[in-house]
Amino acid sequence: MNYAYPDEKGHYGIYGGRYVPETLMQSVLELEEAYKEAMQDEAFQKELNHYLKTYVGRETPLYFAENLTKYCGGAKIYLKREDLNHTGAHKINNTIGQALLAVRMGKKKVVAETGAGQHGVATATVCALLGLECVIFMGEEDVRRQKLNVFRMELLGAKVESVAAGSGTLKDAVNEALRYWVSHVHDTHYIMGSVLGPHPFPQIVRDFQSVIGNETKKQYEALEGKLPEAVVACIGGGSNAMGMFYPFVHDEEVALYGVEAAGKGVHTEKHAATLTKGSVGVLHGSMMYLLQNEEGQIQEAHSISAGLDYPGVGPEHSLLKDIGRVSYHSITDEEALEAFQLLTKKEGIIPALESSHAVAYALKLAPQMKKDEGLVICLSGRGDKDVESIKRYMEEV
């Protein structure tokens, strides 16, 4: 398969690009230049790998979920344990890389957006480590849902700005973070949390997250002597999925499945299934599939999981959908909750609600596969942050 994206202008087919105001163009170009240089620099790579190993705790295990496999009665199910990273999710793979980039560029301050709070915590963590000032924008609704993570960020020395505009969720936090970056661009680096935003952000985040798929490939081959038949990951903006999928894109015998949040159901208005129900538009500096009405107004995304309710999706996922290399599906709040409970009871692993969407789809897929086939789920984060809201949800039902 001939796949080489993005092109030099940052496009993935028709998607991606740089839809930014003139005031940001210089910074985006400066970032691209610095990133290219860093990727060629052995000392930078060495420092990054040092922190990934000794600070983040990589490599993360590829765990054979024997009980879950028996329960499903089909393919062997493996879990890529990104929940075991420092800070409890895949997010830190990217924040550590970008924070080192910020230091390299001579920036003193970092700004970021966060939904579930995981990216905010991972950003505040690396800022504490590297002595950078940290400002995090978070939607008012998410601040309410994720009080513990807000406290964590503040403990780590970050300033958390609550955003009341719009629906008070991730999209609004990104708007404010971008605004802040425009006016502080001389001394501030923006750590985008997913494969979104203007080029080179989707590429930078994908590349830093690709450690997930690269490790998985090596680990699976060592265990089974071949590549897995299927790989499953959840998708909000899509960074854990992109990090998992990208190293497998050329291996056409490996089926790739991206799982979005169907919320209350894709037939309702309450979902975040952008690739299932969206249409093409521009948001936050990039062309991608979006949830929008006929007038092009962005619609609110809904999911029980704060990390999946973004109304867009990374430009590279948009392309991978169009060319059919990845097959995208959606899972409802109910199905995700069932999977959350099942994995917890069967394996003693409490997954994040985001990751539970991937688990839920894998539970449908595994029984349709042969017993000698293998399926890998990207377990993108741990569920500690969700236990409280799940308890509330179950009491209400």
UniProtKB/Swiss-Prot annotation:
Residues that the record marks as modified (N6-(pyridoxal phosphate)lysine) are: 91
Q: Domain of life, per the record?
A: Bacteria
List GO molecular-function terms, semicolon-separated.
tryptophan synthase activity
Q: Name one Pfam family in it.
A: PALP
Pathway given for this chain reads: Amino-acid biosynthesis; L-tryptophan biosynthesis; L-tryptophan from chorismate: step 5/5
Gene3D superfamilies documented for this protein = 3.40.50.1100
The record's listing under SUPFAM superfamilies reads: Tryptophan synthase beta subunit-like PLP-dependent enzymes (SSF53686)
Question: Could you state one GO cellular component term attached to this entry?
Answer: cytoplasm
Catalytic activity line of the entry: (1S,2R)-1-C-(indol-3-yl)glycerol 3-phosphate + L-serine = D-glyceraldehyde 3-phosphate + L-tryptophan + H2O
Kindly list the cofactors needed: pyridoxal 5'-phosphate
Q: State the EC number(s).
A: 4.2.1.20
UniProt keyword terms in alphabetical order: Amino-acid biosynthesis, Aromatic amino acid biosynthesis, Lyase, Pyridoxal phosphate, Tryptophan biosynthesis
Function (record text): The beta subunit is responsible for the synthesis of L-tryptophan from indole and L-serine.
Assembly, in brief, is: Tetramer of two alpha and two beta chains.
User: What HAMAP family does the record point to?
Assistant: Trp_synth_beta
The record's comment on protein family reads: Belongs to the TrpB family.
Protein name according to UniProt: Tryptophan synthase beta chain
